[in-house]
């Protein structure tokens, strides 16, 4: 055996294994029979195939009579010759004579050509028939296989090579059958490409029938046009259209050729039939096989087509052009859709259904051409057996072909839906269009089976089980369907239904729950407070904790006239003073304590008893307990603390100066009751004041816990002598930003060290007025003079020069007799405070009026729960 490469080097093989390995090394694609057998069935060992001459056409040594067949594939510039020898036992291999069979393949431009020559030398006596395929018999008239697989690829750029001579020994009287059906599947190159030119491939068959030297042989050439010999690589484009590669040889019908007759599938060459050869008779009708490709408008196969029906009954006419033609691609696509039920029938649970359907297209076509009388069941059985013996690498091309067909099917579905939307009503259809039920019993089971394609076929597995709808028109261009527009169409179809429901959902949160509204009303009523007083509800019950929140249905808006009258009363200075005078001292003491433990039941009983008493009776009732507690309590607790030590030093220095009173001093105070004036309040006041100023500075909040605060309860004057100023809070007690120790010390240094007695009520209520605005000017706070009975003026008033120097306008109150009081709500730096009880004296700089707000103070006091409405009316009448 000799294998010749492009460089002209010859390779000799000593054995069958060496021969196969040599061919594999120098051949890109090779497919050999499983065994090489002779007539006796023994394997042929080619020990001395080529030892005579290095030339390709040399004759080997004589060998025993045998029949051999082989398959050769060529690629690029390689040229191979495979010589098979079949000799009689008495024949001799003389040099110069061709005693065997030689096959060769090469390229000719864009067409794949092969020349077959037969030399029947020395073989007429035994009647042996040379064959070109494995597993054949020598019976005359039997359809034999020529080639198992011949993948022709595009040659590399270079000079065109002429066709190689392929010679085959044939007896003069024996038939030579050239069958186009391959017995094994095609093995294509991984990187192989087919010629881009479309058209038929010409196969030149040359027969030699002389006995003698090869050079004197008479040859007759016939051109066989075979459509599918133009092979296409996976995914390649042919004329702008994706063409699934044809897999197996499909040529003209099988025609038996007798002796000196050569029949072509399509036409003869230009030379015609030469040298007196008779024209070939027309092929028998029985030999004409119906092609497998169906028309584009062919419907799905009926169920009765399965079973004993023949392949011929289910086939259509073959296309005249190659597989790259768009019409051929479309017909293959329709066949693939028709074969899917058959594939599901044999592989119900396999994901290879689509790939197997692609595999059935060329296999069933070839079986139909080889044996038209073969039933469909037998053809499917042979195809399944061939599929099982196919390697995964060989199946790759079918998976890719199935992937393209799946894309075609998805595109067709989308086009059908669009056409239905255009023809149907204007409203959008439901997002999921019902699809046709797949044919065959096992179809529902395969719907859930995805198709696992090796390359980019995973996401497209869902569309594999869809049945083929009837086409409206032939698809002239195969392109991949864009998945995004399809999704947008489905999204738009789902959007309209929820639109009417969205406004209803957004209106629900706008409604406020009733319990939230009620909670808000309760909080506002608790903060504002005056709404309860406006309803006329007794404030005594509020003091006792028995007040219930008014219901919305019972609440009525207050009378504007009543509100204006209340504002008018609160704007009067005497009205607020009268209200403060009747506040229960026990209630104030418990209320201002750090941990109040109020007995509301006992307090309510006391208040009920006091409702029937007059103001004089109230004073007589409350004054003795106050005197006893004032004597028992320590004097330092009555003085207010200083903020720093410097102010206490100045206070101590001024205490000695107060021992000598100024006869011209006077204060705008009202006269004290007889019980108060009978005591030596001057001396006691000076003693208390001096002791108070020697104390260290303490914040009022800390002083409120001391017993002095509880002892310093207000003393109600007689009915004819009422205080005309609200309770006074000290500057130290308020502890506000305006109260600077420097300012206090500055005022003491100027000599304004006169002190006055502070009402205990105002002193105790100082912490309640910390929210009032601080109106202290930059001028120092004046000090009030001491109040003594002998220093009263003609009208019972006593004014200090410091007050006069500061322009303190003191006018008598219209509600009091022969009494003067400082103007309420004036813009003076400080105001004088009346004496509410004996012995309660504090420094003047601490006597900051907490009622500077005027009407605002009255409005705040209006809603104060400390004064009952009945007592307010009594004071208003006075």
Curated annotation (Swiss-Prot):
This is NUT family member 2E. Belongs to the NUT family. It comes from Homo sapiens. InterPro entries: NUT, NUT_N. Residues 537-551, 622-631 have a biased composition (Basic and acidic residues). Signal peptide: none annotated. Residues 278-288, 427-444 have a biased composition (Pro residues). PANTHER family: NUT FAMILY MEMBER 1 (PTHR22879), NUT FAMILY MEMBER 2A-RELATED (PTHR22879:SF14). Pfam families: NUT.
């Amino acid at each position: 055996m000799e294998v010749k490469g492009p460089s002209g080097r010859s390779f000799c093989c000593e054995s069958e294994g060496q021969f196969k390995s040599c061919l594999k090394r120098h051949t890109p694609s090779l497919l050999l029979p499983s065994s090489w057998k002779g007539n006796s069935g023994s394997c042929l060992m080619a020990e001395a195939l080529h030892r005579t001459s290095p030339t390709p056409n040399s004759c080997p040594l004589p060998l025993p009579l045998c029949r051999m067949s082989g398959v050769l594939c060529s690629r690029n510039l390689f040229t191979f010759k495979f010589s098979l020898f079949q000799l009689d036992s008495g024949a001799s291999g003389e040099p110069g004579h061709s005693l065997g069979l030689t096959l060769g393949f090469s390229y000719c431009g864009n067409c794949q050509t092969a020349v077959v020559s037969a030399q029947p030398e020395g073989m007429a006596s035994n009647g042996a028939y040379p064959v070109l395929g494995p597993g054949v018999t020598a019976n005359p008239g039997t359809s034999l296989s020529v080639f198992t697989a011949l993948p022709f690829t595009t040659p590399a750029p270079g000079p065109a090579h002429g066709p190689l001579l392929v010679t085959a020994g044939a007896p003069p009287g024996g038939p030579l059958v050239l069958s186009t059906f391959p017995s094994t599947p095609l093995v294509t190159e991984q990187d192989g490409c087919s010629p881009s030119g479309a058209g038929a491939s010409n196969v030149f068959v040359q027969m030699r029938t002389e006995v003698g030297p090869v050079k004197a042989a008479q040859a007759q050439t016939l051109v066989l046009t075979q459509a599918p010999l133009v092979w296409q690589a996976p995914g390649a484009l042919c004329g702008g259209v994706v063409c699934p590669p044809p897999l197996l040889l499909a040529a003209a019908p099988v025609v038996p050729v007798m002796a000196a007759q050569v029949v072509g599938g399509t036409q003869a060459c230009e030379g015609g039939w030469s040298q007196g050869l008779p024209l070939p008779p027309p092929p028998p009708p029985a030999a004409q096989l119906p092609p497998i490709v169906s028309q584009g408008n062919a419907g799905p196969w009926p169920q009765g087509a399965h079973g004993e029906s023949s392949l011929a009954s289910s086939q259509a006419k073959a296309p005249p052009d190659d597989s790259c033609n768009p019409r051929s691609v479309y017909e293959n696509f329709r066949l693939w859709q028709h074969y899917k039920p058959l594939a599901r029938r044999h592989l119900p649970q396999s994901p290879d259904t689509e790939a197997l359907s692609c595999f059935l297209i060329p296999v069933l076509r070839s079986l139909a051409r080889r044996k038209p009388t073969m039933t469909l069941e037998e053809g499917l059985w042979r195809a399944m057996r061939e599929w099982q013996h196919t390697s995964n690498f060989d199946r790759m091309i079918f998976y890719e072909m199935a992937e393209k067909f799946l894309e075609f099917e998805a595109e067709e579905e989308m086009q059908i839906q669009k056409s239905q939307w255009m023809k149907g009503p204007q409203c959008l259809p439901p997002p999921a269009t019902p699809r046709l039920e797949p044919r065959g019993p096992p179809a529902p089971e395969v719907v859930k089976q995805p198709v696992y394609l090796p390359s980019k076929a995973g996401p497209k597995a869902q569309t594999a089980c869809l049945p083929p709808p009837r086409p409206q028109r032939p698809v002239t261009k195969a392109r991949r369907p864009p998945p995004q527009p399809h999704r947008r169409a489905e999204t738009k179809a789902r959007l309209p239904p929820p639109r009417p429901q969205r406004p209803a959902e957004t209106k629900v949160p706008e409604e406020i729950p009733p319990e939230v509204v009620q909670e808000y009303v309760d909080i506002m009523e608790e903060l504002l407070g005056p709404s309860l007083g406006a309803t006329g509800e007794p404030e005594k019950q509020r003091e006792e904790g028995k007040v219930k929140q008014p219901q919305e249905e019972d609440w009525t808006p207050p009378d504007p006239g009543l509100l204006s009258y209340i504002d008018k009363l609160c704007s009067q200075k005497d009205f607020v003073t009268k209200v403060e005078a009747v506040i229960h001292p026990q209630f104030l003491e418990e209320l201002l304590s750090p941990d109040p433990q109020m007995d509301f039941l006992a307090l309510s009983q006391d208040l009920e008893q006091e409702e029937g008493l007059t103001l004089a009776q109230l004073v007589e009732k409350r004054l003795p307990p106050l005197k006893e507690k004032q004597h028992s309590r320590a004097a330092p607790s009555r003085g207010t603390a200083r903020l720093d030590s410097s102010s206490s030093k100045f206070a101590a220095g001024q205490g000695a100066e107060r021992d000598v009173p100024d006869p011209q001093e006077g204060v705008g105070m009202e006269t004290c009751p007889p019980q108060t004036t009978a005591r030596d309040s001057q001396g006691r006041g000076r003693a208390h004041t001096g002791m108070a100023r020697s104390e260290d500075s303490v914040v009022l909040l800390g002083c409120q816990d001391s017993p002095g605060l509880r002892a310093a309860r207000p003393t109600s004057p007689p009915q004819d002598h009422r205080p005309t100023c609200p309770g006074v809070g000290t500057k130290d007690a308020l502890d506000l930003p305006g109260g600077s120790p420097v300012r206090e010390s500055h005022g003491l240094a100027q000599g304004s060290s006169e002190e006055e007695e502070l009402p205990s009520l105002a002193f105790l209520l100082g912490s309640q007025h910390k929210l009032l605005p601080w109106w202290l000017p930059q001028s120092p706070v004046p000090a009030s003079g001491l109040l003594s009975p002998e220093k009263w003026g003609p009208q019972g008033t006593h004014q200090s020069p410091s007050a006069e120097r500061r322009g303190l306008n003191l006018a008598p109150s219209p509600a009091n007799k022969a009494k003067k009081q400082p103007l309420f709500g004036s813009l003076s730096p400080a105001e004088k405070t009346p004496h509410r009880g004996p012995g309660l004296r504090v420094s003047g700089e601490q006597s900051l009026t907490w009622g500077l707000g005027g009407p605002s103070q009255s409005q705040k006091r209006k809603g104060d729960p400390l004064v009952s409405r009945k007592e307010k009316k009594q004071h208003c009448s006075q």
